[in-house]
Amino acid sequence: MDSYDLFRRLGAGAKFDVKRFSADATRFQVGKRKFGSDSSETVKGLDFFGNKKSVSDECGGLQTQQELQNEETTEGGLLERSKEPKKKKRKKMTADVPAQEDLDGTIQWTSSVEAKLQDKKANGEKKLTSEKLEHLRKEKINFFRNKHKIHVQGTDLPDPIATFQQLDQEYKISPRLLQNILDAGFQVPTPIQMQAIPVMLHGRELLASAPTGSGKTLAFSIPILMQLKQPTNKGFRALVISPTRELASQIHRELIKISEGTGFRIHMIHKAAIAAKKFGPKSSKKFDILVTTPNRLIYLLKQEPPGIDLTSVEWLVVDESDKLFEDGKTGFRDQLASIFLACTSPKVRRAMFSATFAYDVEQWCKLNLDNIVSVSIGARNSAVETVEQELLFVGSETGKLLAMRELVKKGFNPPVLVFVQSIERAKELFHELIYEGINVDVIHAERTQQQRDNTVHSFRAGKIWVLICTALLARGIDFKGVNLVINYDFPTSSVEYIHRIGRTGRAGNRGKAVTFFTEDDKPLLRSVANVIQQAGCPVPEYIKGFQKLLSKQKKKMIKKPLERESISTTPKYFLEQAKQKKVAGQNSKKKETLKGKS
């Protein structure tokens, strides 16, 4: 081994401080060196131990001066890979990467392999950083959803919104529409609005479930108005279906309120004959949104030619979808099928809203809707937590009336809603309570539309303290400030119970629900008790031990409710006499009219 080889081994991986050892650096030409014909002198200068052999002799006379110069011009010409095995990992140098000069003047040798590894590491860090950022973003969204009890199912889910101002930043909402929302008192979106609005704005079909009084109407009204953008003369471009006229009227009122100043023409079908002329084939088509019940719309569609055109509908919204999808007299499954077929536009999208999830509706949506997103707030089919719920055993049907009168004597905070099983029982209870000295009225399907509208208006205005009703008002109707709901007759299912008590405790306000039950209601108690317990309200221990009903038994109970004793305390003899007098009076009127005509 000569001095040249020794120097190469001693200098492997070393750093040279050019500033500190400038003389030596100049002498040994470290750094940016210009190699000339005197390269042999440089080699001689490295002969510290007086070894007189030339490089050519050492290399067997095969290496020329030009080859030596080429070797020195490569990176680390003075350095070679060590052939000895090393236990520790060290930086390896090759002869194809030039030396890098640090800012402090030192020279640091870097191999091409190491450079590639460093580049790969840097790229990996960048990649990891972007992945981490995306992961953090998703974690924040999941935390936000969990905080507000938002449960979402589907693919490629849109992010929820936290404020209505985000609609301006991300979706370019009309300034007037945004101002109307804020002026109406909606400062912060509710959980269902946080997720349902972005889903509909992305044009996705939706199945949404949220507790009663959680703002579902606004959740579909805002995206409809945003996506329609402005009024056009193409006919109806949005259709909202609800099970009752009272609920349809409420939705119509809310849509007009938040669309004020935007120019949208929002209509509701009051009388089918007038609607056929107004919306028929010869109409000007100067309308945008229609809110209606299924039966009135079906009547128009069956006309020849059809009394209404739905071929331009872009959004079909079904409110209280689980009720509308029911079979039998109380459901509208067949009517909905006809309405769906009438909406033939390729742009049509559908959204289903309800306070409860029905298995039939969910399965139908998965089979028939395209790339559907399912959104639910809180536990499925659960009662709203702002309602204090109580089960009250009254023994028999007679005990119900006694308990009702006891509540009146103790005093209550109106307004109060009282639910009964049938129209006949609603009339009977009304006649019993009218003599208790309280402002009471009744609403049911046998009353005229004008009477129903007047009753609802009086109840909203506070003129009526206690309103007796059937299941007609259990769906969707929003009465501001209802403090107490009394289930005079036990509901036929937990779903009906949830909708009934949902008339109180709305929009974050507190409310109370009292449910009377007798020995005859024992088969239905268990399912309702589970709902009450899930909401955090106490349930007697003995009720928890009751046997569960089979699904067939539940369906039978819903279709054929219990036969109950009459509420009326008036003896049957007097009731029959009153009926006879009524019939006699009607007959005498008919005779008088016939005489007048003759």
Swiss-Prot record:
Where this protein primarily resides, as one coarse class?
A: nucleus
Catalyzed reaction equations: ATP + H2O = ADP + phosphate + H(+)
Q: What EC number is given for this enzyme?
A: 3.6.4.13
Please provide an example of a Pfam family that matches this protein in its UniProt record.
Helicase_C
Span(s) of short sequence motif DEAD box? 319-322
Q: Which Gene Ontology BP terms does the record give?
A: maturation of SSU-rRNA; rRNA processing
One cellular component term from this protein's GO annotations in UniProt: nucleolus
Function as written in the Swiss-Prot or TrEMBL entry: Required for efficient ribosome biogenesis. May control cell cycle progression by regulating translation of mRNAs that contain a terminal oligo pyrimidine (TOP) motif in their 5' UTRs, such as GTPBP4.
Q: Which family does it belong to?
A: Belongs to the DEAD box helicase family. DDX52/ROK1 subfamily.
Q: What is this protein called?
A: Probable ATP-dependent RNA helicase DDX52
Domain Helicase C-terminal, residue spans: 386-547
> Where does the record place it?
Nucleus, Nucleolus
- Binding positions (ATP): A210, P211, T212, G213, S214, G215, K216, T217
Q: Give the Basic and acidic residues compositional bias ranges.
A: 589-598
Q: Which SMART domains match?
A: DEXDc, HELICc
Q: Where is the Helicase ATP-binding domain?
A: 197-375
Name the segments for region: Disordered: 59-98, 578-598
| GO molecular function (one) | RNA binding
In-chain residues carrying the UniProt-annotated modification N6-acetyllysine: K15
Q: Where is this motif: Q motif?
A: 166-194
> What's the encoding gene here?
Ddx52
UniProt keywords (A-Z) are: Acetylation, ATP-binding, Helicase, Hydrolase, Nucleotide-binding, Nucleus, Phosphoprotein, RNA-binding
- Modified residues annotated as Phosphoserine in this record: S39
Origin species: Rattus norvegicus (Rat)
Q: Where are the transmembrane segments?
A: none
